[in-house]
Amino acid sequence: MNLTGGITWHWLAWRSQARWAPTSNAIENWLMQQAQAFKPEAVEGQPNLLLIGASAGWMMSSRWLGQFARVDTFDIDPFAGMLFKWRHGAALKAQGTELHCHTQDAMQNLPALLSKHPKACVFFDNVLGQVRFQHPANDWQVVEKKLQQLKVTLKGREWGSVHDRMSGPTLETIAEGSC
C-alpha cells in the first residue's frame, strides 16, 4: 500500500487545502520569484515542463504552471492525472498551456524521458525527499550517490525541486523561509 496515493489520500488532501494554504502560497511565491529570474538560454519562446511526482497538483499553482507552453505530469498514482486535470485543466487551457498527464514512474527511466524532451524544464514535486525511504536507513551513502548522479543527469537543464518539510502537526511554528 502506498500512503501517498489512492482515492483516500486525495480526499484527505482535498479536505486539507485550507490548512495547507499558507504552504501552497509560499511555494507559489517562491516559484514565481524563480520564474522572474529564469530565462533558459537553450529555450526559445515559452519552455515546456516535466512535472515529476505531480500527484493532483495539490501544492502547485495554476498561475505558475501557466507560464509553460506544455506541461507533462508524471505520477505512479492512477488517480493523479484525472485529478490534476480537474484541478488545473481549465485554468491551463485558458492560459494556452497544453496539459498531458502520464501514469508512470518517471524516475525509473529519467534519461530516456529527458532525451524525449531535450529542452524541457524539470520540476520534482515531493519526490527527491522520498528517495531515502526507498533504501534501508544504513544505506545513506547509496541515497547520497543517487542524488549526486541526478545533478549530473540534469546538468545544463533548468530544474528544481520542492519537498514539504513536515507533513503533519509540529511542536513549534516553523518560520517561512527557514528551510
Across the structure, where does each feature detected by a protein language model lie?
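A short SAM/SAH-binding and catalytic strip from SAM-dependent methyltransferases
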Residues: 119-138
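Class I SAM-dependent methyltransferase Rossmann-like catalytic core
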Residues: 1-44
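Conserved SAM-binding loop of SAM-dependent methyltransferases across substrates and taxa
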Residues: 55-68
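Conserved SAM/SAH-binding beta-strand->alpha-helix loop
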Residues: 77
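A short glycine-rich, Lys/Arg-flanked "PGG" loop and its adjoining helix->strand segment in the class I
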Residues: 115-117, 137-159
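Conserved class I S-adenosyl-L-methionine
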Residues: 44-57, 157-179
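S-adenosyl-L-methionine
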Residues: 85-116
